[in-house]
Design a protein with these regions (language model features):
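Conserved GNAT acetyl-CoA-binding A-motif
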Residues: 89-99, 240-252
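Acetyl-CoA-dependent GNAT
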Residues: 54-56, 63-68, 131, 163-164, ...
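Conserved active-site alpha-helix within GNAT-family acetyltransferase domains
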Residues: 101-118, 230, 254-272
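Conserved acetyl-CoA-binding loop-helix of GNAT-fold acetyltransferases
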Residues: 75-84, 215-221, 225-242, 260-265
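Conserved beta-strand-loop-alpha-helix junction that forms the acyl-donor binding cleft
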Residues: 96-102, 221, 250-260, 277-280
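Acyl-donor-binding surface of acyltransferase catalytic domains
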Residues: 54-58, 65-138, 277
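Short amphipathic alpha-helix that is part of the acyltransferase structural core
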Residues: 1-30, 131-169
Length: 280
């Protein structure tokens, strides 16, 4: 059977949607990418989406750009995609997605792309499809631009703690601040204060295919262990399901047992496993 790898075009999108529908939680980042293109005032184009076609039928896909994301890739598709990535060289900051696919793809490009700064091989993906049965913290609200003075340092602190490097390095400060401001404007940022002190925040980084992917969950260090996270996350889920999407999801490092226990207490269930390869 004849196969080829090529950038997607408008004629391929129906087939992409079929892939997304197989697992919307797994593929919400791809769904968000397509929805973003639909909102553009320009003719949609997809140079960052490479498809693996077999006799004209889309079987697998690779998102390229700031992050490499394999989508429904078979062993042979990963071999073909790896060859493309080796020729182009590394331009991305991470590879992220289903663990088996990410780790196999990384094994095929590591000699030419390596070394990785860190490989996180086991990241449980958790999801909720109904509101939490836990008590909800009514003080959690959407953030607004008056919160940015407190919010941006908290976001930088959380990112640095989670990823191991500040998002402001190499001149990235303005772009990162603009990104947080965009999330605030889009009602995808949530905060809780005690008095005038910001003690909790979370964002929705991606919305697609009816799934909102939560990121950046943070409790101020001196307030951890005080029972803030569970009712606060229950409130975030309620706001998401009321305004953004019927499904809330997130993924977390397997060694962060405290966070996993908190999320499961809220009502999140383990539905998948991701892996992330981080580059400097």
């Amino acid at each position: 059977m004849a196969h080829e790898i090529r950038a997607l075009d408008a004629h391929s999108i129906a087939q992409v949607n079929s892939l997304i529908e197989q697992d919307p939680v797994r593929h919400c980042l791809l769904a968000a990418r397509l929805e973003q293109s639909k909102q553009s005032r320009f003719r949609p184009s997809y140079p960052d989406l490479l498809g693996y076609f077999d006799d004209g039928k889309l079987k697998s896909l690779l998102m390229t750009g700031a992050n490499i994301v394999p989508v429904n890739t078979s062993l042979i598709a990963r071999q073909e995609f790896a060859a493309v990535l080796e020729r182009s060289g590394r331009r991305s900051s991470s590879i992220v997605g289903p663990a088996e696919e990410v780790l196999d793809l990384w094994s095929k490009v590591s000699d030419s792309w390596g070394p990785a700064r860190e490989v996180r091989a086991n990241q449980p993906v958790l999801a909720m499809r109904s509101n939490s049965l836990k008590a909800i913290d009514d003080d959690v609200r959407y953030s607004n631009h008056s919160d940015l003075e407190e919010l941006i340092p908290a976001c930088i602190a959380m990112f640095t703690e989670e990823v191991g490097i500040s998002p402001t390095v190499n001149g990235g400060g303005n772009a990162y601040r603009n990104r947080i401001s965009e999330l605030v404007s889009g009602r995808r940022s949530f905060v809780k204060y005690l008095g005038t002190e910001l003690v909790f925040k979370a964002e929705v980084g991606t919305v697609g295919a009816g799934v909102a992917q939560i990121q950046g969950v943070w409790v101020k260090p001196e307030f951890r262990g005080r029972g803030i996270s569970v009712p606060a996350m229950a409130a975030v889920v309620k706001l998401i399901m009321a305004d953004l999407a019927p499904v809330a999801s997130l993924y977390v490092n397997d060694y962060n047992e405290v966070a996993i226990n908190a999320y499961q207490s809220v009502g999140f269930e383990h539905v998948d496993t991701f892996a992330t390869v981080l580059f400097s």
